[in-house]
Amino acid sequence: MISIQKYVRAKSLEEAYQLNQSRANRVIGGMLWIKTGNGSVNTAIDLCDLGLDGIEETQEAFLIGAMTSLRRMELHQGLNTYTQGAAGAAVRDIIGVQFRNLATVGGSIWGRFGFSDVLTFFLSLETFVELYQGGIVPLEQFAALGYDRDILVRLIVKKKPGVFAYRAFRNQRTDLPVLTCALSRMEGEYRAVIGARPGRAIVVRDEEGLLSGGQTEGRYNAFSAYVARVVPMGSNTRGSAAYRTHLARVLTERNLMQIMESGGK
């Protein structure tokens, strides 16, 4: 069990940032995974009063505040229209509605959890993170970094024309995923993202041109096999490395078929 000595609702990002410079303090987000750990927090920093709990849609992008709940993301009409329903599909099996009403997008992204559906999904989009001190950084770059004392303010998803698909395999519906797989085709570039390896999600691009020159079943098989071959897998209680490699091929191919059927030829 985690113990908290002091609770502060930050009045500004500057106040939250300054408090967070002490290693004994912590930004709490939705407080769902943090409370399952052990240890002591001197000051728990809550960002709930800073107006970061919504999704703003502009002509160029979606601006998703760090305190936006997964449930709000799941139900957001604009985001789901843009991603052909992939946004909702990426989070709908995360525990339950009550959990998704509390869990935050920022907490999920900052945690860079190896089991994260959220990280897998957003890596398949043209996504950037806005950090209070670090500025705007591509999510793919941010996902590979270590943890520091900065504050994640929001996600920025550029509206790059494309088609999208998301699938995950779970041993039971509300369990943590055995493997996650997002796939996108934006302006001719295919991007497959594999997570729950078990490890942070990895982006795979069609660097060998396996999908160029027209989409066929043979090309889908070749690219799916390529993704399964290049992504490092591991074993845990939910599945073996060999099983995850098999799932990567199957889920990638099914996402490719979905993209083709939705007009991504």
Model-assigned labels for residue ranges:
Residues M1-K265:
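C-terminal structural segment of proteins
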